[in-house]
Amino acid sequence: LTPRPVRPAYLGVLGRIAPEKGVDRAIRIAARCGIPIKIAAKVDRADQDYYDELIRPLIENNPLVEYVGEIGDREKSDFLSGAIGLLVPIDWPEPFGLVMIEAMACGTPVIAYNRGSVPEIVDDGLTGFVVEDEISAVAAVDRLADLDRGQIRKVFERRFTARRMALDYLAAYRGLMEEAEPRVRLVSSAE
């Protein structure tokens, strides 16, 4: 994923519509800010009732909300580059939020609830904001313009590329090899 030369114009939600993902909270955050929100997400069969009962009523006849459905990798760069920020108002301990890293790859800041891996991924005040609730998320939206999208991309390149991961693995293996004692010890030379 790479940044696209577009003018950001909406808040974004990417991924899956499920209670723990907080799409209803994202819609309320955008509404409180008076900013349009685009939701690019799938609805799994198990979450259909949540969508029908809670999300659909928030979307229908709401000019600020656009539900675009599930998108593929080809559309993600455009979607994320067009977002002022990505909202991730989760209420479960997300082990690793890939959508946050995808946003950062496009230079898009992230506003995410302080759950699970969020504080390890989002550098508060640099790549986005780690927040506690809807009120602090609304306040963070007002500060998104202060963040440098080019710097967000640089942080992604420094921390989350496949090359970075491979180098980290090599360093870990080297460290383990240096710490390990040899399994075979020579008592004396054969000469």
What are these regions (language model features)?
Residues I39-A41, D52-R74:
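Nucleotide-activated donor-binding/catalytic signature segment of Leloir-type glycosyltransferases, i.e.
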Residues L1-A40:
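Conserved donor-binding/catalytic core segment of Leloir-type glycosyltransferases
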Residues S81-P95, T108:
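Acidic donor-binding loop of glycosyltransferase active sites
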Residues G97-M100, V118:
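Short glycine/serine-rich donor-binding loops of glycosyltransferases
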Residues E70, D78-A83, Y169:
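Short alpha-helical donor nucleotide-sugar binding micro-motif in glycosyltransferases
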Residues A105, P109-A112, V122:
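Short hydrophobic beta-strand element within catalytic cores of glycosyltransferases
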Residues D146-D168, G175:
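A short, well-ordered alpha-helix in the C-terminal region of glycosyltransferases
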